[in-house]
Amino acid sequence: MPTHSSSRPRLLRGLTAATALATLAGGLAACGGDSDAATGTGDAASGSVTIGRLSNGAATEITLKVSEVKSISAELPADVKKSGKLVIGHGVLPSGSAPLEFIGEDQKTLTGSEADIGRLVAAVLGLEPVSRNFTWDNLFVGIDSGKVDVGFSNITDTEERKRKYEFASYRQDNLAFEVLKSNPWKFDGNYENLAGRTVEVGSGTNQERILLEWQKKLKGEGKKLTIKHYPDNNAVHLALSSGEIDAHFGPNPTISYHITQTAKSPKPTANAGTFSGAGDSLQGLIAATAKKGSGLAEPVADAINYLIQNGQYAKWLAAWHLSNEAVTKAEVNPPGLPLDNG
């Protein structure tokens, strides 16, 4: 099953779909293949990190005070501490995915919720953040080879991945229902509320698998759930605004981003409820990912917990409109998607 965001937003504020994709792809391509990107979104050495800078309206820019916590940086592996740098990998190539990770409006700076949490963690650890951009598959090659210390790239915690990697969780892995703001319907965590509805979902995705399971249950109860597919997000959003579908079911970050983009449009959308990407038996989690045995998961988790306890974490999520994916505690290697999932 897919364990990375499987739905990509097609619009950036003030840009046509074609221009937006060209902008993202061009900016990322300008960084080379698997390469470094500019990271100038704050000065951790001076005790601050700027969240949402150059996001083209995807986030609310805010500067957070955060400095090294010596008791946590003391936990770092000796080689990482000596280097003075935290090399952070992002599976952002070729085109990026707002609001998670994408090239900012200056065409060179990596921005997004994933980039920003990596910078915050580096600040707590007293390290200079160095961002490296990869394709999704090559991100893991980078971690395996030691080119990357830790990946912050919307990576789902799975038991399969624990064979090679260690995790520090920092966000819930949620799916969401997007509806017109004028539509009072709510999911409320109950599949029975889908009876009589028409819902769009991406073909071949984890969310489609979940929706098909609900459709089967409803059919057994003599109720109908109509499922539709469209070729791209533009078609999905057109169908939603025209009333052809009642809801779109997809990754929560993508939907949260699109909601911000429609806020001032004639037909704004809203979130009608979320559901764990792992299904009803487990809360899926997004986690910082390091090579197994690297000794990085523990200090990274402690850094995240420091940010949770001191308020920067909540402000980071709020800036990116992702507060509904907050965790109360970062955990090292929490239960992940089981080996037999999907």
Residue ranges and their predicted role:
Residues 128-193:
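Acidic, polar ligand-binding/catalytic clefts
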Residues 47-70, 123-124, 205, 283-319, ...:
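Extended ligand-binding regions for polar small-molecule ligands
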Residues 26-30:
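C-terminal motif of bacterial Sec signal peptides marking the signal peptidase cleavage site
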Residues 172-179, 263-302, 323-342:
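Periplasmic-binding protein-like
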Residues 155-162, 211-213, 217-218, 246-282, ...:
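A ligand-binding cleft/hinge motif common to bilobed small-molecule-binding domains
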Residues 94-95, 108-124, 155-157, 173-232, ...:
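Bilobed "Venus flytrap"/periplasmic-binding protein-like clamshell domains
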Residues 32-35:
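Bacterial signal peptide processing site
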Residues 41-151:
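Extracytoplasmic small-molecule ligand-binding "clamshell" domains
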